[in-house]
Regions:
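Inter-repeat boundary and helix-capping residues of tandem alpha-helical solenoids
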Residues: 9-12, 52, 91, 131, ...
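TPR-repeat structural position
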Residues: 31, 72, 111, 131, ...
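Generic long, charged, amphipathic alpha-helical segments
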Residues: 192-226, 294-298
Length: 368
């Protein structure tokens, strides 16, 4: 409050206070406030003879804001100069900048680049013997492995990870214990899910007591995901509604998308309920849609379409009706309808127009 109400410009002597406020805003899940505070930190860096370290830290927090709001191009453009800043490594934030940048590239569909960044950070920290940073980096490595479908690698990390103690400050961009809970849920075993449930319950109490809203949101979302995969759909919606209500003021989007497709069904039910968070839920679902398109492009979904479906898709693109398509291909209208429904399902579309747009986005169709 003192910084916000200060009559004059914030000076270099107040830099530690501004940095502390950045972390407070982050843990409070107040992305708008964090953006403002990070601006102040960048200005201090500019005033202090272009202090590269101060500018790098300000860019780190700006990058977090842009990433969580799913503004991926802005996040990348903001983080790259922070990583290149000569004093960033001395500040100790270079690894954290690298973690967020890797998440950006993963979200952009550049999985190999994301993996290369994290693996390079782990190798560097192993050489330098920086134990605390390596601890976080290996958790990030496991998190990325899980997101890229390399469950065995994530499971190997989990086998060697002790979640205790849970009493420490969660102030960076990820929490290793939450990665562990995700691995246990992904394993699909009853024992793993039971362990995940107990850990998440402990973390919920710890984070609520510390007013750490940022990671409380993620814990609630993971609890909803766990309940969803266990078939407890009503409970999943109730818990997820709490998470979304906490996330909406700050505009958090990526937090949900990064947890995976299991959250889509309860999010859709929340959206249909048309509550006070319906608009924000729509933004999250739209980001899930974008994520699927990126992933689908990597997996070449076009290969899943049959030759007949591809022919029908091309005819849909030139706006032929079902009757015209049946005459063109000498098949019944019922057969056209069946193939069209298969096309919609494979492209996750709900209309002809949406199917054609997605097919063009995935380079299944071209205008030529």
């Amino acid at each position: 409050d003192a910084l916000a109400r200060a009559p004059g410009p914030i000076d270099e002597c107040q830099a530690p206070l501004v940095a502390a406020l950045c972390f407070i805003d982050w843990m409070a899940a107040d992305l708008s406030a964090l953006h403002w505070t990070a601006n102040q930190y960048c200005r201090i860096g500019e005033i202090a003879s272009g202090d590269a370290g101060g500018l790098a830290l300000g860019r780190y927090f700006h990058g977090l804001v842009y990433y969580q709001r799913n503004e991926l191009a802005l996040a990348e453009a903001t983080l790259l100069p922070a990583l290149a800043a000569p004093k960033a490594p001395r500040l100790g934030y270079r690894t954290e900048v690298s973690f967020v940048l890797a998440a950006v590239y993963q979200a952009l569909g550049q999985a190999d680049r994301a993996r290369q960044i994290i693996d390079s950070v782990c190798a560097h920290l192993l050489r330098t013997g920086d134990g605390p940073a390596l601890f976080r980096a290996q958790a990030r490595q496991a998190d990325l492995a899980l997101r890229q479908g390399r469950l065995d690698e994530a499971r190997e990390w989990a086998r060697n990870f002790d979640p205790d103690p849970i009493h420490f400050g969660y102030r960076f961009s990820n929490v290793p214990q939450l990665t562990l809970a995700r691995v246990w849920i992904a394993e699909g075993s009853g024992e793993g899910r039971e362990q995940a449930g107990r850990l998440l319950q402990l973390l919920e109490g710890e984070l609520a007591a510390r007013c750490n809203v940022r990671f409380l949101i993620e814990v609630l979302a993971l609890q909803a995901m766990l309940q969803q995969v266990q078939g407890e759909t009503t409970a999943a919606c109730e818990v997820l509604a709490r998470a979304v209500a906490l996330a909406q003021p700050g505009g958090f989007i990526r937090l949900f998308v990064d947890l995976g497709q299991e959250l889509v069904p309860p999010l859709k039910r929340l959206h249909l309920a048309r509550g006070s968070s319906a608009r924000h839920v729509a933004h999250i679902l739209s980001a899930f849609d974008d994520e699927w398109l990126v992933s689908a492009g990597r997996q070449q979904v076009g290969a899943d379409l049959t030759r007949r479906e591809l022919k029908i898709l091309k005819l849909l693109a030139v706006r032929l009706s079902n009757v015209e398509i049946s005459e063109e291909l000498c098949i019944s209208r019922a057969t056209v309808k069946r193939h069209t429904q298969n096309i919609y399902r494979k492209l996750r579309a709900s209309s002809r127009r949406e199917a054609v747009v997605r097919a063009r986005t995935l380079n299944i169709l071209t205008d030529g």
